[in-house]
Amino acid sequence: MKNVINFYYNLYPENIFQTMRGYYFFIGKWRYFFVQYLDDIDEVKKIYDRHLYLLNNNIYVHHIIVNKDGNVLTFIDGKYYVLMLTVYYDKKISFDDVAFFSSKIIFSDMVINNGSIWALKNDSLEYQVNMLGYNYPLMRESFSYFLAFGETAIQLFNSIEKNAFLSFSHKRVEYLEDSYDFYNPFNILIDYRVRDVVEYLKSKFFSGLDIFDDMVNYFNKNNLSYDEYLIFLARMLYPTYYFDLIEEIIKGKKKDDDLSELIN
């Protein structure tokens, strides 16, 4: 891998280390991550331009390093890789980190239709559970209960006029997530500004911790519109945590018994 980094990036680290995420190395005080890119290739330019916008507006994300050909992706042994320069990578994020990141408003006429996205996810999971549920007793017994929360969230979201601000958000935000994932530009998207805060609070709540003070502080510091409060509630109702775990179980990455802590 040293030869790859030397040739494509004109960087000459003394050592390269491999982890579950990919590879990393140091040059001086700077830490670089060389990781596989698994998402849609057509989205790469949009992600790169978005990360430049964030950096130019003093919002920290890991800096994407282009290769000698000026490309974000480097094709090695049949796989695409990206190189990122990181400053923050092993610190656990706090609620204040999440709230600050999502406080940067984007003025756009972009339409975010969470209702349709959630409905498609519900239908897909319901079909898979009906087909495979006999292998997973806890999944089979609990799915209808959480599906009802999902349907209620969809109905509420679809009834809202969406007088709400957009901001940069994340595909997923979890309590005690490390800063490597949080500031990874490939994890960032655009959504309503309450998205990250809600997902963080749900994750913290299901870790057995109180979230009341965080919610009160957030509401006091942010002038949410009426519609934003409703979107906040709809996202709170939608059981992201449960559906994510169901998908992991179906893929064989988790076990049916892992549901017990969530549903008992």
Residues covered by each model-derived region:
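C-terminal structured domain segments
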Residues: N223-K254
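ATP-binding pocket architecture of kinase catalytic cores
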Residues: G28-M110
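ATP-binding glycine-rich phosphate-binding loop
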Residues: K2-K29
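ATP/Mg2+ or Mg2+-diphosphate-binding catalytic cores
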Residues: D123-Y127, Y242-N264
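ATP-dependent phospho-/nucleotidyl transfer catalytic cores
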Residues: E14, L38-I41, N113-S169, D213-N217, ...
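Short acidic, S/G/P-rich loop/turn micro-motifs used as interaction or catalytic elements
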Residues: D39-I41, Y89-K91, Y175-E177, F186-N187, ...
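Active-site Asp-x-Gly
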Residues: S179-L224
